[in-house]
UniProtKB/Swiss-Prot annotation:
GO-annotated cellular components: extracellular region
Subcellular location per the Swiss-Prot or TrEMBL entry: Secreted
Keyword Repressor: no
Miscellaneous remark of the record: Negative results: does not show inhibition of peak current of Nav1.2, Nav1.3 and Nav1.7 (at 460 nM).
Expressed in which tissues: Expressed by the venom gland.
GO molecular function per UniProt: sodium channel inhibitor activity; toxin activity
Lineage of producing organism: Eukaryota, Metazoa, Ecdysozoa, Arthropoda, Chelicerata
Domain LCN-type CS-alpha/beta: 1-66
Species of the source: Centruroides limpidus (Mexican scorpion)
Stated name of the protein: Beta-toxin Cll2
Length: 66
């Protein structure tokens, strides 16, 4: 599974500005989804890959980013 890293309290994607390989996104994806996860910056949001199937990614149901 893959998808955008989401802040569960706000419903917003984690923003990033250095597209492609991005240490911040990689670190945040691993912290939220485990050491097997990967991550990079895609379209100014942290995109995580190699996730377990039940991983929660953006968008959250009934939670819009404010």
């Amino acid at each position: 599974k893959e998808g955008y890293l989401v802040n569960h309290s706000t419903g917003c994607k984690y923003e990033c500005f250095k597209l492609g390989d991005n240490d911040y996104c990689l670190r945040e994806c691993k912290q939220q989804y485990g050491k097997g996860a990967g991550g990079y910056c895609y379209a100014f949001g942290c995109w995580c890959n190699h996730l377990y199937e039940q991983a929660v990614v953006w968008p959250l149901p009934k939670k819009t980013c404010n």
